[in-house]
Curated annotation (Swiss-Prot):
Enzyme class: oxidoreductase
Name listed for the protein in its UniProt record: 4-hydroxy-3-methylbut-2-enyl diphosphate reductase
Active-site residue numbers: 126
Reactions that this protein is recorded to catalyse: isopentenyl diphosphate + 2 oxidized [2Fe-2S]-[ferredoxin] + H2O = (2E)-4-hydroxy-3-methylbut-2-enyl diphosphate + 2 reduced [2Fe-2S]-[ferredoxin] + 2 H(+); dimethylallyl diphosphate + 2 oxidized [2Fe-2S]-[ferredoxin] + H2O = (2E)-4-hydroxy-3-methylbut-2-enyl diphosphate + 2 reduced [2Fe-2S]-[ferredoxin] + 2 H(+)
Length: 313
């Protein structure tokens, strides 16, 4: 049995930054530290931070007065920011800078009353935060997920239209939606550079390159992780069965029956410790040597807020 390890995999710069913000806040200000929504979508990471004193909530109303709250990497709406300001909560913003870039695009369009189409998954916190940047009553903002949604879309002014996308989508599927938008609305404008984040692109490329060489793909990531789900879906689209897991005990022997090569990758919110635990579980079940593949080098780094840089930990 051969176990091939994708590269790049796991943590991206935005996730690294978000986790560091929570860790530094816990160290410098002491527990409890409140975090609005899971700071990143990984059960392993969230449980570790809970044990250190982080309290995860879904609404600001759950945060007591005079406390610290951290916004998750997925971003929040302007309404949430305004509520925190009105309550004079101390806020540390762990929103990924690449998500903030999309927020700025939407806010800029809103100020000019340009209608905006967001490509994304309904209910995802990043989508909720991005939709919440639009305030113009003269324009409008619309959510689409697939090309068929575009055909049903009714806008006020097709000549004054802009699109943005969630940062963790399938590269191929997003391209299909953009193609349909351009077909239905020939004058639509978009970002100069794709909104899909570099880490999402790189991890999908790594799966694309590896899928034909393996018989089954194990994606390390949580079920609520958008980018991890896209990796599993991409593998299956390419003809290689894929399984998503964030717990070694969930890995089943039946996944590997009749297989000789196993591919392992990890979503952008999955830590390397968890990847190693999953690999150990696979080896305990079926044996096998691990070969780490070469891949695109990532050197992106995002600073934590200045207030959290005062003290090294």
């Amino acid at each position: 049995m051969k176990i091939l390890l994708a590269n790049p995999r796991g943590f991206c710069a935005g996730v690294d930054r978000a986790i560091s913000i929570v860790e530094r806040a816990l160290e410098m200000y002491q527990p409890p530290i409140y975090v609005r929504h899971e700071v990143v979508h990984n059960r392993f990471v969230v449980e570790g931070l809970k044990q250190r004193g982080a309290i995860f909530v879904e609404e600001l109303s759950e945060v007591p007065d005079d406390n610290i709250v951290i916004f998750s990497a997925h971003g929040v709406s302007q309404a949430v920011r305004n509520e925190a300001k009105e309550r004079q909560l101390t806020v540390f913003d762990a929103t990924c800078p690449l998500v903030t870039k999309v927020h700025m695009e939407v806010a800029r369009a809103s100020r000019r009353s340009v209608e905006v189409v967001l490509i994304g998954h309904a209910g995802h916190p990043e989508v909720e935060g991005t939709m919440g940047q639009y305030a113009s009553e003269d324009g409008g903002m619309y959510l689409v997920e697939k090309p068929e949604d575009v055909e049903k879309l009714q806008v006020k002014d097709p000549s004054n239209l802009h699109y943005v996308s969630q940062t963790t989508l399938s590269v191929d599927e997003t391209a299909d939606v953009i193609d349909q938008l351009r077909k239905v609305f020939p004058e639509i404008q978009g970002p100069r550079k794709d909104d899909i984040c570099y880490a999402t692109q790189n991890r999908q490329d790594a799966v694309r390159e590896m899928a034909e060489s393996v018989d089954v793909m194990i994606v390390v990531g949580s079920k609520n992780s958008s980018n991890s789900n896209r990796l599993r879906e991409l593998s299956e689209k390419l003809g290689t069965p894929g399984f998503l897991t964030d717990c070694p005990e969930d890995v089943q022997p039946v996944w590997f029956e009749g297989k000789t090569k196993v591919g392992v990758t990890a979503g952008a919110s999955a830590p390397e410790d968890l990847v190693n635990q999953i690999i150990s579980r696979i080896q305990a079940l079926i044996g096998g040597d691990v070969e780490e593949l070469s891949g695109r080098e990532e050197n992106m780094f995002f600073e934590v807020p200045r207030e959290l840089q005062v003290k090294n930990i």
